[in-house]
C-alpha cells in the first residue's frame, strides 16, 4: 500500500521545508522505494504562471506543461525524477474544480462546503499523485505556516487521511525554527512548542520535528522539545545552515531520519547507499577553480527568480572542478557607455527568460557586447529573442527591429506571436508550455553539446522567431541550429564566427541535475573557462 508523508511548517515561512522534503525523498529513493512528491500552495491563484517573480520567484515548468512552484525544481534536482501537473496543487485549483463539479450538478443539489467537498478534493489530489506514478511513498509539502487561515482546509484534509487509511500509512513531519538570541546568548524552544501546540489543536500530532537553527541543538534542548511536543527524542532532527544544499540529505541520514520514517511506516528496506551523493558533496566542497558569469536580468534583486539557472550553472561547473560565481547585473542599468564596466570582468554572459519591456534595451547592449567581443554567451527564451533582435539591428541594419510584444508598431517584427496565439485572450495557462522536440543541425555548437539529432526540452513562451527574416539572417552568419521537427519554429540560434554564442527558445535550466548537467549549460561553462584561461 502507498505510504503518505506530510511536511508542514511553523513559526516562520522560508524554513526550507522544500529542501527537507526533497532530501528525505532522495534518501527513500536510495533505499529502493518509488518516491513521488508534491507541493500544496494555499494561495487562490490557479497556478503561479501569471504571478510576478518578485511575489513568487521562478515559475518551474514540468514536462506536461504545468506552471508550478519553484520547490518542484528542488524536488526534481534532488530526487532525480520528472514531476507532472499533479505535483503542484493550489487553493485556486481546488476551488475551481469543486465549482465546476457543482455547475455540472455532481453534488446532486447538496450544499457545497469546505468539509467535506473541499477537503475531499484535496485528498483526491494526494491519492491521485500516488496512483499516477505507482508510488511506494508520496511526500506532500503543505505551503505556508501552521496558523495561517489559508492552510486550514489542507491541514484538515491531511488529518482525515490518517483516519481514512490508518496510522501506519501516514506520517507527519513538522519543520520549525529555534531562534538564537544574540543579546541573551541562548536559543529558544518556545516558538516551536507553540507551533506544535497549534498543529495538535487541529488534530495533527507530528511524528518528527525538524528544527532549523544557526547553532547546534543540545541534547537537553532535544529532550525538552520531545517532552513538550510528545515525540521521541530521536525524532527531533537538527537542520543546521549548510555550506551547500546538497549536504542536507547526508545530515538527515546521519540523524537516522530516513530510518525513523521507515520504522513508523513499516517499510522494510535496506539502508540508503549514499556513496555517489557523498562524492558529489565532497566535490562541491572542494572545487579548485573559479569562473565568473554575468547574469543580466530584470529580477536580480530576488535571486529566487532565476534559481534553476543558477543551479544549472553550478552543476555545469562541477563537471570542470569549477566554482561558478554569478555576477548579478540589473539589465535596467546597462548602457553602451557602462557595459564594459559591468560585464568586462566576467568570462561569460547569460541573458535569461522574462516578459515585458523593462530592461530589454540593457539586455540587448549586453548581447551586442558578447557578440562583438567574442565573449561566450547563452540566451534563454527572451534571451534568444533579444539575440535575434540585436543581430537584426546591428548586423543587418534593420533600424527599429523589435518584438511585437515589446513594440507592436515595430517596422521589423523579428519576434512575433505564434500563429495559434493570435486569438488567445486569457493570460493564464495559455503559453506554449511543456516538453517539445527540437531537431538539431549537425556541425553546430548545439549538436556538439547534445550529440543527438533530436532532443526534448521544456518551453514557456508565446512569441517566436519570425521566419520571413531567416534567409537574410542566415546569409549574414546567423545559424538556426535547432528547429521544431517540421522546421517551422526556431528553437536554437547561434553565430558562425564566434567561439560560443548559443541561445535557445526553451528553458534548458529546468532539466539540469547536480550529477548530470544540462548539455548547453555544460558547454557554455566550458567555453567560459576557456575564455578565462585565454585572457
Curated annotation (Swiss-Prot):
Limits of the Glutamine amidotransferase type-1 domain: 292-534
Pathway assignment: Pyrimidine metabolism; CTP biosynthesis via de novo pathway; CTP from UDP: step 2/2
E.C. number: 6.3.4.2
Chain residues that bind ATP: 14-19, 71, 240-242
GO terms under cellular component: cytosol
Chain positions recorded as Mg(2+) binding sites: 71, 141
Positions bound to UTP: 13, 188-193, 224
Enzyme class: ligase
Activity regulation (UniProt): Allosterically activated by GTP, when glutamine is the substrate; GTP has no effect on the reaction when ammonia is the substrate. The allosteric effector GTP functions by stabilizing the protein conformation that binds the tetrahedral intermediate(s) formed during glutamine hydrolysis. Inhibited by the product CTP, via allosteric rather than competitive inhibition.
Subunit structure: Homotetramer.
Xref: HAMAP family: PyrG
Name of the molecule in the record: CTP synthase
